Amino acid sequence: MGPSPHNAAMGTLYLVRHGQASFGSEDYDRLSDLGRRQCAQLGAWMQAKGLRFEGVLRGSLRRHQESLDALASQLPGLPDALEWPGLNEYDSEAVLRSVQADELLRPDTPEAYRQHFRLLREGLTRWMAGEVQPAGMPSWQGFLQGVTSALDHVRSRHQGDVLLVSSGGPIATAVAHVLEAPPTTAIELNLRIRNSALTEFAFTPKRHMLVTYNTLPHLDEAPYTDWVTYA
């Protein structure tokens, strides 16, 4: 009998969505105070678990850097991060404008909030189908390539634990890709992912395998259960 595949040497890729940002403000791309605390608490959880990362990747957005800084405040000895622009989020305003020519309402009322996400779903679906091209953004295939190139890099360069800090869109896209699901699956995955949530892939040089998605082990107990946010 051959060795069990579960005994084969595998690395683990820990994908982290950024902490709470400034949704609805003039500058979304910065963490709130709660967002920093969420990520610092995740770093403390990782430290308590004895995780040691041999590699770190992050997107190039401000909220990615600030999230990693908060994680690192509780994780001494992290390797220098490799900045990977392919891990940047899509431009949600550009997606919205691709399907809505009228002035966009700030999502600060229940009705405006529902309209925001209805239009976002429509814009993302049409972008993925090649029916619209949001201004200043890559094609859907280009966006997907940015994400999968990061996964390829991890498989080819690492064998142990790797930390990746990104956004909901790229992480959801990575999950859908690994599961060989339709691209539109990434939309629903994306709209459910929580701030500072952890997603885990086991990996070998040939492939990634989903282990967990959108978990918050660092916020499972009081007083942290009130820290759960989505934007």
Label every PLM stretch briefly:
Residues 19, 168, 214-216:
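Active-site metal-binding loops of divalent metal-dependent hydrolases
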Residues 2-9, 88-112, 141, 156-161, ...:
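Acidic, low-complexity terminal tails and accessory targeting/binding regions
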Residues 163-165:
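ATP-dependent carboxylate-activation loops
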